[in-house]
């Protein structure tokens, strides 16, 4: 089946098949216009959007049976709003903010209020490993515990805001269940971060 197509104007891959169909139709129109002198009769372009042309069926058959298998995982690293991308980055999305220096005064005040220096260092180490890409090789998970108002949800919300589009929400209890066939559903797109607020780890050994 169709997986993704490179969109040069965006500098990103697209997993939306409609983008592929529109791009193919556009290229067909350009070819027909540039080569009309080569044809004696009127040229009719068999567009993808026209179901009666049969091209959409041929396209699906090609994707399913004839296209060479060249699968590559998308979005396995962070792309910031100011990151220059190429095909080889295999990115289909960007974060909505740039990676650049700035003031962290408000963040610094919040973190120093909620967490001890040691706890903060561990949390920021984990966040940093995601930014650098090391988390894919480290593959660790953090458990935040404590009473209400101790900052558990605060840092998780910050992480979600930092990695919008790159995280998923999972159910720890379901992961430890042998009867839940969809326990790993949250990980099917290989998110860089998986988060659960108020999780139950009693089933994980």
Where are these regions (language model features)?
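P-loop NTPase catalytic core of nucleic-acid-dependent motor ATPases
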Residues: 1-18, 71-192
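Intein modules and their embedded homing endonuclease domains
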Residues: 1-90
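Conserved AAA+/SF3 P-loop NTPase catalytic/coupling segment centered on the Walker-B
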Residues: 190-205
